Amino acid sequence: MRVRVATTILGITAALLAVPACSTDSVGTEPTATPSARAGKPTSGTTVLSSAALETRLLDENDLGSGYLRKPERPAQHDDVTVIGCPALNELGGDAATGGSLAFPRKAKASFTYNGTAVEVSEELYSDSATKLSEGIGRIFEAMTGCPTYQVVAGGTPIGMASQKLAPPRGLGDEGWSQLLTFSAGARSTVVKQTAIRDGSLLLIVSGSPALVDRHLDKALDKALATS
């Protein structure tokens, strides 16, 4: 069965065309909700932040250190991809096809290349009620990890997908999700890690090279939760 799914859900497939193959890190077992934010760290509470406020909380080159260059933001894409062989994504298809799954109106995003290569790390911030954020991102991760293997066709290019649930870092935020995605097209294979942390009314998603995601996740969450 085929289902049309918005690239909001599977936009990360573009990484296959940009990121060279990288080895997988050691992985955990099942993702679980994590306890509330670390002791002594600020939390977002119930305040819903504007997109402009979220933009100021994104990491920048100074936060990341030498070797990182922010990529220009591309215009929003409304193309869709075809998902083959994944019932979990089939069930999500109606919602995703309208762009509703991560269509939170208050959001900000930044993507960076590293050391002049195609290796990337990206950060997304969203703000809404805790319930909406939790249900929205939870539905996406459940669907994307609901099938160990499936295929997407993006821009006429067939891409083999393999997904693996990971245990999110403990002690970060109120809830956490993490997954490892392997993209295969022809002779090329790329591994991308994606970790999401919800803290109150704020949702952080860091995606990209597994090593870079692990390196910058804590820093991204600290800045996202910092009060001015």
Regions found by a protein language model. Name each.
Residues M161-K223:
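A short, solvent-exposed beta-edge/loop patch
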Residues V48-S50, V121-D128, V206-G208:
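Second-shell loop/turn segments in exported
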Residues R70-F183:
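A small/polar (G/S/T-enriched), proline-flanked helix-loop surface module common
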Residues L58, N62-Y68, P72, M144-Q151, ...:
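Sec/Tat-exported extracytoplasmic proteins
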Residues S23-R106:
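N-terminal "mature-domain start" segment
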Residues A18-A21:
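C-terminal motif of bacterial Sec signal peptides marking the signal peptidase cleavage site
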Residues S51, E55-E61, G65, S134-F141, ...:
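Extracytoplasmic/secreted envelope proteins and their assembly/folding machinery
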Residues M1-L10:
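Bacterial N-terminal signal peptides that target proteins for export
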